[in-house]
Swiss-Prot record:
Record's protein name: Trigger factor
GO molecular function, one term: protein folding chaperone
UniProt-listed Pfam families: FKBP_C, Trigger_C, Trigger_N
GO cellular component assignments: cytoplasm
Segment forming the signal sequence: none
Residue ranges of every copy of the PPIase FKBP-type domain listed in the record: 161-246
Length: 436
């Protein structure tokens, strides 16, 4: 077999491969013999059909299948011989398929980029530290109470944070518009669910009262037909209900699976959850900084095949997340290309760090991570056992642990600054923290 390779771009390779005719004929004859053993032809006993008849009936198909098998096998042999690492399936261009002659074809494909990860010592990391103070715990208890707010009918005028049951009809230029009317809608004043001025205009209203609100849709309103237009809403208040926060009692604690331990037991469990969230938030922020630093220090070209595959995965995820009667390939690829490129490049960089430093998942850390996740459930032992009985889930945890070990490897050489902050700042999402 003859093989020559041409580098057409930084990542694209063009393999010209010639396979001796004898190998093709051997593969064709093998196919024909397999067919002869199974062929059922009237007038002949199974396995006794003359080869001339087999060739007449099945020769063309046998040759086509044999050529396909030889191309697949010879391509694999060629990339091994040339020490190439394909990043996707090849495009095959046949040059000569004539029977009795050598098979000639060209395979065009991309390879994985070859590089060494560098620049660890130039990465600056701010590592936060924080504790869950008693005041943080008190704030969390209030949040939990508000999340379980109940509303009771109030015989008074509406205030902010009250829940109103309303009917309304909206009109633009004297005409009702699609989506502008509803009956029996529950609306909490101050929730900002409606356009500016709508909720404010109902403060002070009582059950049975009708109010007319003259408002204007925001210029950036999502419905362009309504953006910036004046509108009139006629609103009827059916009822006014005031919020009632639940008491911190056994009934409330039971909603969270905590029984017979009282307020102190409840505070202990909530604190544990907050501390777990704090550890995860700090770890996540450090990881994001490390990954950003690796990206900046290691610009690499991405194989188009990998990028295309990742875009397709993100399309499928988007459809699964948001639903709707739409097929993944109907979503524009441009929406996902930036995210896809980041994920592909990081995947290549992380894999190279693992290779360079010969990293393997630390099984002690794997168990610790599983136990940490399991501690959020009422039966943690069962959760741990479930992970160790499911190879797919267990391997996913191993992958996460391996990424953490990559982060640790970078941190050993990066410029790390420790900073003590409040619990609230530590758990705040990175985007929100940057905006402050």
């Amino acid at each position: 077999m003859q093989v020559s390779v041409e580098n057409t771009t930084a990542l694209e390779r063009r393999l010209s491969i010639t396979v001796p005719a004898e190998r093709i004929e051997t593969a064709v004859n093998k196919r024909l013999q397999q067919t002869a053993q199974k062929a059922k032809i009237a007038g002949f006993r199974p396995g006794k059909v003359p080869m001339s008849e087999i060739k007449r009936r099945f020769g063309a198909d046998a040759r086509q299948e044999a050529v396909g098998d030889v191309i697949q096998a010879s391509f694999y042999e060629a990339v091994v011989e040339q020490k190439l690492n394909p990043a996707g399936s090849p495009s095959i261009e046949p040059k000569s398929l004539e029977a009795g002659k050598d098979l000639e074809y060209v395979a065009v494909f991309e390879v994985f980029p070859e590089f060494e990860v560098a620049g660890f010592d130039g990465i600056a990391i701010e590592r936060l530290s924080a504790e869950v103070a008693d005041s943080d715990l008190d704030n969390m208890l209030e949040i939990l109470r508000k999340q379980n707010t109940r509303f009771e009918v109030a015989e008074r005028a509406a205030q902010n944070e009250d829940q109103l049951n309303i009917d309304f009809v909206g009109k633009v230029d004297g005409e009702a518009f699609a989506g502008g009317s509803a009956k029996g809608t529950q609306l909490v004043l101050g929730s900002n669910r409606m356009i500016p001025g709508f909720e404010d205009g109902l403060v002070g209203a009582k059950a049975g009262e009708e109010r007319v609100l003259n408002l204007e849709f925001p210029a950036d309103y999502q419905n362009l037909d309504l953006a910036g237009k004046a509108a009139e809403f006629t609103v009827t208040v059916n009822s006014v209900s005031e919020p009632k926060l639940p008491e911190l009692n056994e009934e409330f604690f039971a909603q969270f699976g905590i029984k017979e331990t009282g307020i102190e037991g409840f505070r202990t469990e909530v604190r544990k959850n907050m501390e777990r969230e704090l550890r995860q938030a700090i770890k996540s922020k450090v990881k994001n900084q490390v990954m950003d630093g690796l990206l900046a220090a290691n610009p690499i070209e991405v194989p188009k095949a990998l990028l295309s595959n990742e875009v397709d995965r993100l399309r499928v995820q988007a459809v699964q997340q948001f639903g709707g009667n739409i097929k993944p390939d109907q979503l524009p690829a441009e929406l996902f290309e930036e995210q896809a490129k980041r994920r592909v490049v990081l995947g290549l960089i992380v894999a190279e760090v693992v290779k360079q430093f010969d990293l393997k998942p630390d099984e002690d850390r794997v168990r610790e991570m599983i136990q940490e996740m399991a501690s959020a459930y009422q039966e943690p032992e069962q959760v741990v056992a479930w992970y160790y009985k499911n190879d797919q889930q267990l391997n996913e945890v191993r992958s996460v642990v391996l990424e953490e070990q990559v982060v640790d490897t970078v941190l050993q050489k990066a410029k790390v600054t420790d900073k003590a902050v409040s619990y609230e700042e530590a758990v705040k999402p990175a985007e929100a923290a940057q905006a402050d």
